[in-house]
Structures are given as structure tokens and as C-alpha cells.
UniProtKB/Swiss-Prot annotation:
This is Serine-protein kinase RsbW. It comes from Bacillus mycoides (strain KBAB4) (Bacillus weihenstephanensis). It catalyses: L-seryl-[protein] + ATP = O-phospho-L-seryl-[protein] + ADP + H(+); L-threonyl-[protein] + ATP = O-phospho-L-threonyl-[protein] + ADP + H(+). The lineage of its organism: Bacteria, Bacillati, Bacillota, Bacilli, Bacillales. Belongs to the anti-sigma-factor family. Its EC number is 2.7.11.1. One of its GO terms (molecular function) is protein serine kinase activity.
């Protein structure tokens, strides 16, 4: 049996000024689903990075389109960001990027590639497909209230 989910799909011009619309939409969807504030902030950064990569690299001189699909599941939000522009080899790029090295001078930091590292760090799962264009599938799981062994929820609130 296929897992039930709701789908929201959007298409926007691949221009920097439209990335904020996607961030706001994602925040609204995540809030409705019950995500914690910190998780929503992480997802906003990740989706911004994915969209900005498309704006900067996918279409060169042409103005293309970004397709965004939100898959709303009971326990997670899946976000697909796709373009039909110029692709690149993610494995090659991934091998060249990594965490910030505190021993390296700032002027030696790479200008590109940190966005994918950020996405990978902030999301619970990431898959990248590059055939015709690039598709980034990011997943964030909802962190529900933790339950102790006796079945009582753990709370940070005092009861008076």
C-alpha cells in the first residue's frame, strides 16, 4: 500500500528575487505540519541554497524555471527542487567540499560548493539526480514529543 501524502507543486522563474517566495511557502507548510522553529530555519537555509544554485548555475544567460514540490507526509516533509538547465557532477563536487577548516585563512575558503555541504548538513536526507538538469530531493523528519519508558511525555514546562 502506498504511503499517503499531500503534494504542493510550484514553478517560479529562476531569478534571485523569487527565492524568498519559496522560503515563505516552505515555512508556512512546515509550520502547519508542526515542525520546530529550528528545523524550519534549517529547511529555509537548505531550500534557499538549492534554489540559489539553480539561479546561479543552471541557465547561464537564459532565464529558466525552478520546479518545487513539497511532499507532506505524517512524519516528514520532502522537498524537491528541480531545473532543466546545465547539470554538474555532484560526486566530483562533493569530494572537493567539506566543513570549514579553522586552520585555513579566510581568503582560501572556496567560493562555491558550500551550499551543497550546508544542505547535506541541515537536512536528514538528501538525494541528487543529474540527468537533464538537476533535481535535489531533501527530507526533514518531524521531531515529535519524546516519551519516557513509562509512557509519560517529557516536558520542559513546570506544572504548578
Amino acid at each position: 500500500m502506498m504511503e499517503k501524502f499531500e503534494k504542493i507543486e510550484m514553478k517560479i522563474p529562476a531569478k534571485a528575487e523569487y527565492v524568498a517566495i519559496i522560503r515563505l511557502t516552505m515555512a508556512g507548510v512546515a509550520n502547519r505540519m508542526g515542525f520546530a522553529y529550528d528545523d524550519m530555519e534549517d529547511m529555509k537555509i537548505a531550500i534557499s541554497e538549492a534554489c540559489t544554485n539553480i539561479v546561479q548555475h543552471a541557465y547561464k544567460e537564459d532565464v529558466g524555471e525552478i520546479t518545487i514540490v513539497f511532499g507532506l507526509y505524517e512524519d516528514r516533509l520532502e522537498i524537491m527542487v528541480a531545473d532543466n538547465g546545465v547539470s554538474f557532477n555532484f560526486s566530483t563536487l562533493k569530494s572537493k567540499v567539506g566543513p570549514y577548516d579553522i586552520n585555513k585563512p579566510v581568503e582560501h575558503l572556496p567560493e562555491n560548493g558550500l551550499g551543497l555541504y550546508l544542505i547535506n548538513t541541515l537536512m536528514d536526507d538528501i538525494q541528487i539526480m543529474h540527468d537533464e538538469g538537476m533535481t535535489v530531493l531533501m527530507t526533514k523528519y518531524i521531531q515529535r514529543e519524546q516519551v519516557e519508558n513509562d509512557g509519560n511525555p517529557i516536558s520542559t514546562y513546570r506544572s504548578y
